[in-house]
UniProtKB/Swiss-Prot annotation:
Protein name from the UniProt record: Coiled-coil domain-containing protein 43
Family, per entry: Belongs to the CCDC43 family.
Source organism: Homo sapiens (Human)
Cross-link (Glycyl lysine isopeptide (Lys-Gly) (interchain with G-Cter in SUMO1)): K95
Record-level GO cellular component terms: cytosol
Biased composition (Acidic residues): 138-149
Taxonomic lineage of the native organism: Eukaryota, Metazoa, Chordata, Craniata, Vertebrata
Keywords: Coiled coil, Isopeptide bond, Phosphoprotein, Ubl conjugation
Positions where Phosphothreonine occurs in the chain: T139
Residue stretches of biased makeup (Basic and acidic residues): 176-211
Keyword Cell inner membrane: no
Coiled coil regions in record: 121-145, 177-218
Start-end of Basic residues biased regions: 212-224
Annotated region described as Disordered, given as residue ranges: 138-157, 176-224
Amino acid sequence: MAAPSEVAAIAPGEGDGGGGGFGSWLDGRLEALGVDRAVYGAYILGILQEEEEEEKLDALQGILSAFLEEDSLLNICKEIVERWSETQNVVTKVKKEDEVQAIATLIEKQAQIVVKPRMVSEEEKQRKAALLAQYADVTDEEDEADEKDDSGATTMNIGSDKLLFRNTNVEDVLNARKLERDSLRDESQRKKEQDKLQRERDKLAKQERKEKEKKRTQRGERKR
């Protein structure tokens, strides 16, 4: 379990799809390794978000192999994956709490809204009773029966309207959250594809540098 200081360091933030603390940590780690964080930071985040657990290490090694020695490559990739997992534990907990609070607030507002028809209904019944008493058009028994029927119908209508209103609005909230997640995932995928092309170019450039260095070494040996 992460210590309190570690939890604070990986608390969720906006704009990097996982957590502000993790994004900052990853940028610093890549910079220390001599990796272009502007290009590879978002690409690594996309892999951590989209790939299955067992595929993350392989994907990270494929990216960072162009920059790291083989003896340190695996340990650094494991470090990144473990840090990401710690971040997600915190982010998941916060998101669940936020969703519960949002739904609770929504239901509370709905309850306040559906109280108004009940108050209007009581006022109408009082006016009706006063009118009936004034003109004595019905007997006391009929008046009581009418009151009972009106009350039952009003309660049933309010209950149905309340349930429909609650279900509709909760569904709207959940649908909006899903659309937002889908949009972020699509954007991440586009960024992932662009960064993959950049990674291939970097690997090719590195290979060319190695070939040139090898040729220079061979020429030097022939001269000796």
